[in-house]
Amino acid sequence: MKLKSLKPVPIIRLRNILSTATILVWVVVFIGFQSNAQETISDNSLSDKEKSIIKIASHTAQGDLLQLKDVLHEGLDHKLTVNEAKEVLVHLYAYAGFPRSIRGLQTLLEVLEERTAKGIQDDWGAEATTIDDSRSKYERGMTILEELVGRPLDGKPEYQKFSPEMDRFLKEHLFADIFERDVLTYKQRELVTISVIASLGSLEPMLRSHLNLSLNVGWQAEQLKEFTETLVITTIEDNVFATKTVLTEVLKRRTE
Protein backbone atom coordinates (compact mmCIF):
# COMPACT_ATOMS: atom_id res chain seq x y z
CA MET A 1 0.00 0.00 0.00
CA LYS A 2 1.38 3.32 -1.06
CA LEU A 3 1.32 6.10 1.54
CA LYS A 4 0.16 9.51 0.41
CA SER A 5 2.70 12.22 0.89
CA LEU A 6 1.71 14.92 3.39
CA LYS A 7 1.23 18.34 1.90
CA PRO A 8 3.13 21.12 3.61
CA VAL A 9 0.95 23.58 5.57
CA PRO A 10 1.04 26.98 3.92
CA ILE A 11 2.96 29.54 5.97
CA ILE A 12 0.00 31.95 6.11
CA ARG A 13 -2.28 29.20 7.42
CA LEU A 14 0.32 28.17 10.02
CA ARG A 15 0.55 31.75 11.21
CA ASN A 16 -3.23 31.89 11.56
CA ILE A 17 -3.22 28.70 13.63
CA LEU A 18 -0.49 30.04 15.92
CA SER A 19 -2.27 33.37 16.23
CA THR A 20 -5.53 31.65 17.19
CA ALA A 21 -3.73 29.47 19.75
CA THR A 22 -2.09 32.54 21.28
CA ILE A 23 -5.44 34.29 21.58
CA LEU A 24 -6.96 31.24 23.27
CA VAL A 25 -4.10 31.13 25.79
CA TRP A 26 -4.60 34.81 26.63
CA VAL A 27 -8.36 34.29 26.98
CA VAL A 28 -7.76 31.47 29.47
CA VAL A 29 -5.27 33.61 31.41
CA PHE A 30 -7.65 36.58 31.41
CA ILE A 31 -10.57 34.48 32.65
CA GLY A 32 -8.40 33.07 35.43
CA PHE A 33 -7.26 36.55 36.39
CA GLN A 34 -10.83 37.84 36.41
CA SER A 35 -11.94 34.91 38.55
CA ASN A 36 -9.19 35.53 41.10
CA ALA A 37 -9.92 39.24 41.09
CA GLN A 38 -13.62 38.55 41.62
CA GLU A 39 -12.82 36.33 44.61
CA THR A 40 -10.65 39.08 46.08
CA ILE A 41 -13.39 41.66 45.56
CA SER A 42 -15.93 39.29 47.09
CA ASP A 43 -13.71 38.67 50.13
CA ASN A 44 -13.31 42.41 50.73
CA SER A 45 -16.93 43.33 50.11
CA LEU A 46 -19.88 43.25 52.46
CA SER A 47 -22.23 40.35 51.85
CA ASP A 48 -25.94 40.91 51.23
CA LYS A 49 -26.57 39.52 54.70
CA GLU A 50 -24.17 42.04 56.28
CA LYS A 51 -25.75 44.91 54.35
CA SER A 52 -29.11 43.77 55.67
CA ILE A 53 -27.81 43.98 59.23
CA ILE A 54 -26.75 47.58 58.60
CA LYS A 55 -30.13 48.51 57.12
CA ILE A 56 -32.12 46.79 59.88
CA ALA A 57 -30.11 48.48 62.64
CA SER A 58 -30.20 51.88 60.96
CA HIS A 59 -33.94 51.98 60.27
CA THR A 60 -34.78 50.61 63.73
CA ALA A 61 -32.63 53.22 65.46
CA GLN A 62 -34.44 55.98 63.57
CA GLY A 63 -37.91 54.51 64.10
CA ASP A 64 -38.57 54.15 60.37
CA LEU A 65 -40.80 51.10 60.64
CA LEU A 66 -42.10 51.05 57.06
CA GLN A 67 -38.57 50.83 55.68
CA LEU A 68 -37.65 48.43 58.48
CA LYS A 69 -40.36 46.01 57.37
CA ASP A 70 -38.93 45.98 53.84
CA VAL A 71 -35.33 45.39 54.96
CA LEU A 72 -36.39 42.66 57.40
CA HIS A 73 -37.99 40.82 54.47
CA GLU A 74 -34.80 41.45 52.50
CA GLY A 75 -32.58 40.21 55.32
CA LEU A 76 -34.54 36.99 55.76
CA ASP A 77 -34.41 36.46 51.99
CA HIS A 78 -30.62 36.85 52.23
CA LYS A 79 -30.44 33.98 54.76
CA LEU A 80 -30.40 36.03 57.95
CA THR A 81 -31.96 33.63 60.45
CA VAL A 82 -34.93 34.69 62.54
CA ASN A 83 -32.84 34.52 65.71
CA GLU A 84 -30.08 36.63 64.13
CA ALA A 85 -32.60 39.28 63.07
CA LYS A 86 -34.13 39.22 66.54
CA GLU A 87 -30.69 39.51 68.15
CA VAL A 88 -29.85 42.57 66.04
CA LEU A 89 -32.99 44.23 67.41
CA VAL A 90 -32.22 43.17 70.99
CA HIS A 91 -28.59 44.31 70.79
CA LEU A 92 -29.36 47.81 69.60
CA TYR A 93 -31.52 48.71 72.62
CA ALA A 94 -28.26 49.32 74.50
CA TYR A 95 -27.56 52.18 72.07
CA ALA A 96 -31.00 53.34 70.86
CA GLY A 97 -33.15 52.48 73.88
CA PHE A 98 -35.93 50.03 74.72
CA PRO A 99 -38.70 51.82 72.76
CA ARG A 100 -36.87 51.55 69.41
CA SER A 101 -35.86 47.96 70.11
CA ILE A 102 -39.37 46.89 71.11
CA ARG A 103 -40.94 48.55 68.05
CA GLY A 104 -38.37 46.73 65.95
CA LEU A 105 -39.29 43.39 67.51
CA GLN A 106 -42.99 44.08 66.95
CA THR A 107 -42.24 44.83 63.30
CA LEU A 108 -40.29 41.59 62.97
CA LEU A 109 -43.30 39.68 64.32
CA GLU A 110 -45.50 41.31 61.66
CA VAL A 111 -43.01 40.34 58.96
CA LEU A 112 -42.89 36.73 60.17
CA GLU A 113 -46.70 36.55 60.15
CA GLU A 114 -46.78 37.86 56.58
CA ARG A 115 -44.16 35.37 55.44
CA THR A 116 -45.88 32.45 57.17
CA ALA A 117 -49.16 33.40 55.47
CA LYS A 118 -47.34 33.23 52.13
CA GLY A 119 -45.99 29.78 52.97
CA ILE A 120 -42.41 30.97 53.51
CA GLN A 121 -40.57 28.89 56.09
CA ASP A 122 -37.65 30.88 57.47
CA ASP A 123 -34.71 29.30 59.25
CA TRP A 124 -34.85 30.15 62.94
CA GLY A 125 -31.17 29.36 63.45
CA ALA A 126 -29.26 28.69 66.65
CA GLU A 127 -30.25 29.91 70.09
CA ALA A 128 -27.72 31.49 72.44
CA THR A 129 -25.71 28.85 74.30
CA THR A 130 -25.76 28.68 78.09
CA ILE A 131 -22.93 30.59 79.79
CA ASP A 132 -20.79 28.31 81.95
CA ASP A 133 -18.42 30.73 83.68
CA SER A 134 -18.09 31.04 87.44
CA ARG A 135 -16.58 34.53 87.31
CA SER A 136 -18.71 37.56 88.13
CA LYS A 137 -20.47 39.30 85.26
CA TYR A 138 -18.32 42.37 85.88
CA GLU A 139 -15.13 40.32 85.40
CA ARG A 140 -16.51 38.60 82.30
CA GLY A 141 -17.61 41.92 80.84
CA MET A 142 -14.19 43.43 81.49
CA THR A 143 -12.51 40.50 79.73
CA ILE A 144 -14.72 40.90 76.66
CA LEU A 145 -14.15 44.66 76.54
CA GLU A 146 -10.38 44.17 76.72
CA GLU A 147 -10.64 41.61 73.92
CA LEU A 148 -12.48 44.15 71.77
CA VAL A 149 -10.04 46.94 72.59
CA GLY A 150 -7.04 44.66 72.13
CA ARG A 151 -5.20 45.62 75.31
CA PRO A 152 -5.58 45.63 79.12
CA LEU A 153 -7.60 48.56 80.42
CA ASP A 154 -5.95 50.71 83.06
CA GLY A 155 -8.11 53.22 84.87
CA LYS A 156 -11.55 54.52 83.93
CA PRO A 157 -12.83 57.48 81.94
CA GLU A 158 -14.12 60.44 83.93
CA TYR A 159 -17.79 59.70 83.34
CA GLN A 160 -17.37 56.23 84.87
CA LYS A 161 -15.62 57.71 87.91
CA PHE A 162 -18.50 60.16 88.22
CA SER A 163 -21.07 57.38 87.76
CA PRO A 164 -19.81 53.97 88.98
CA GLU A 165 -23.31 52.68 88.23
CA MET A 166 -22.79 53.31 84.53
CA ASP A 167 -19.45 51.48 84.66
CA ARG A 168 -21.13 48.50 86.30
CA PHE A 169 -24.03 48.46 83.85
CA LEU A 170 -21.68 48.62 80.87
CA LYS A 171 -19.46 45.78 82.10
CA GLU A 172 -22.14 43.52 83.56
CA HIS A 173 -24.97 44.08 81.15
CA LEU A 174 -23.70 45.30 77.78
CA PHE A 175 -20.40 43.42 77.58
CA ALA A 176 -21.44 40.37 79.63
CA ASP A 177 -25.19 39.80 79.26
CA ILE A 178 -25.41 40.99 75.65
CA PHE A 179 -22.01 40.42 74.02
CA GLU A 180 -21.73 36.91 75.52
CA ARG A 181 -24.79 35.80 73.57
CA ASP A 182 -23.27 33.93 70.63
CA VAL A 183 -26.23 34.27 68.26
CA LEU A 184 -24.17 37.09 66.74
CA THR A 185 -20.37 37.32 66.62
CA TYR A 186 -18.47 40.26 68.11
CA LYS A 187 -17.86 41.36 64.54
CA GLN A 188 -21.56 41.37 63.70
CA ARG A 189 -22.38 43.15 66.96
CA GLU A 190 -19.96 45.95 66.17
CA LEU A 191 -21.56 46.29 62.74
CA VAL A 192 -24.93 46.72 64.45
CA THR A 193 -23.44 49.22 66.88
CA ILE A 194 -21.82 51.51 64.31
CA SER A 195 -24.99 51.36 62.20
CA VAL A 196 -27.06 52.61 65.14
CA ILE A 197 -24.61 55.28 66.31
CA ALA A 198 -24.07 56.63 62.79
CA SER A 199 -27.82 56.78 62.16
CA LEU A 200 -28.61 58.58 65.42
CA GLY A 201 -26.15 61.33 64.52
CA SER A 202 -24.09 63.79 66.62
CA LEU A 203 -22.29 60.94 68.40
CA GLU A 204 -18.87 61.27 66.78
CA PRO A 205 -16.79 60.34 69.88
CA MET A 206 -18.67 57.05 70.31
CA LEU A 207 -18.61 56.44 66.57
CA ARG A 208 -14.85 56.95 66.52
CA SER A 209 -14.42 54.46 69.36
CA HIS A 210 -16.59 51.80 67.76
CA LEU A 211 -15.08 52.20 64.30
CA ASN A 212 -11.74 51.40 65.95
CA LEU A 213 -13.30 48.39 67.66
CA SER A 214 -14.76 47.30 64.33
CA LEU A 215 -11.27 47.27 62.82
CA ASN A 216 -10.01 45.38 65.87
CA VAL A 217 -12.55 42.57 65.44
CA GLY A 218 -11.80 42.06 61.75
CA TRP A 219 -13.67 44.52 59.56
CA GLN A 220 -11.48 45.82 56.75
CA ALA A 221 -11.11 49.47 55.77
CA GLU A 222 -12.79 48.85 52.41
CA GLN A 223 -15.71 47.13 54.11
CA LEU A 224 -16.21 50.08 56.46
CA LYS A 225 -16.14 52.44 53.49
CA GLU A 226 -18.82 50.27 51.90
CA PHE A 227 -20.71 50.49 55.20
CA THR A 228 -20.82 54.29 54.85
CA GLU A 229 -22.16 53.91 51.30
CA THR A 230 -24.92 51.62 52.57
CA LEU A 231 -25.92 54.34 55.04
CA VAL A 232 -26.65 56.62 52.09
CA ILE A 233 -29.94 54.79 51.55
CA THR A 234 -30.90 54.51 55.24
CA THR A 235 -30.18 57.85 56.91
CA ILE A 236 -29.81 61.58 56.25
CA GLU A 237 -26.93 63.16 54.37
CA ASP A 238 -25.48 64.88 57.47
CA ASN A 239 -25.13 61.54 59.26
CA VAL A 240 -23.44 59.94 56.26
CA PHE A 241 -21.02 62.85 55.88
CA ALA A 242 -20.14 62.77 59.59
CA THR A 243 -19.55 59.01 59.46
CA LYS A 244 -17.30 59.25 56.41
CA THR A 245 -15.33 62.07 58.07
CA VAL A 246 -14.80 60.12 61.29
CA LEU A 247 -13.85 56.95 59.39
CA THR A 248 -11.26 58.88 57.36
CA GLU A 249 -9.73 60.22 60.60
CA VAL A 250 -9.70 56.76 62.20
CA LEU A 251 -8.01 55.10 59.22
CA LYS A 252 -5.43 57.89 58.98
CA ARG A 253 -4.49 57.62 62.65
CA ARG A 254 -4.11 53.86 62.48
CA THR A 255 -1.57 54.18 59.66
CA GLU A 256 0.54 56.91 61.29
Language model segments and positions:
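Amphipathic, charged-and-aliphatic alpha-helical interface segments
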Residues: 50-62, 188-203
